[in-house]
Amino acid sequence: ACKDNFAAATCKHVKENKNCGSQKYATNCAKTCGKC
């Protein structure tokens, strides 16, 4: 299940700020963060 549960803009922002390490974002922005 490789998808972003949060809005695309939110996940883009998360990745730019290197917040993909956060469990919340790693799970909800899996596609953008490449966690799958």
Curated annotation (Swiss-Prot):
Subcellular locations according to the entry = Secreted; Nematocyst
Q: Any keyword Disulfide bond?
A: yes
Major localization class: secreted
Origin organism is Anemonia sulcata
Q: Any idea what job this protein has?
A: Blocks voltage-gated potassium channels Kv1.2/KCNA2 (IC(50)=140 nM).
S-S pairs = 2-36, 11-29, 20-33
The entry's cellular-component GO terms read:
extracellular region; nematocyst
Which residue ranges does the record annotate as region Crucial for binding to potassium channels? 24-25
- GO MF terms on file? potassium channel regulator activity; toxin activity
> Which domain of life, per UniProt?
Eukaryota
Q: In its UniProt entry, what is this protein called?
A: Kappa-actitoxin-Avd6a
Keywords for this protein: Disulfide bond, Ion channel impairing toxin, Nematocyst, Neurotoxin, Potassium channel impairing toxin, Secreted, Toxin, Voltage-gated potassium channel impairing toxin
Q: Which family does it belong to?
A: Belongs to the sea anemone type 1 potassium channel toxin family. Type 1b subfamily.
Its taxonomic path starts at:
Eukaryota, Metazoa, Cnidaria, Anthozoa, Hexacorallia
Residue ranges of the ShKT domain?
A: 2-36
Q: Which residues of this protein are annotated with the site description Important for binding to potassium channels?
A: 6, 13, 22
Record bears the keyword Acetylation: no
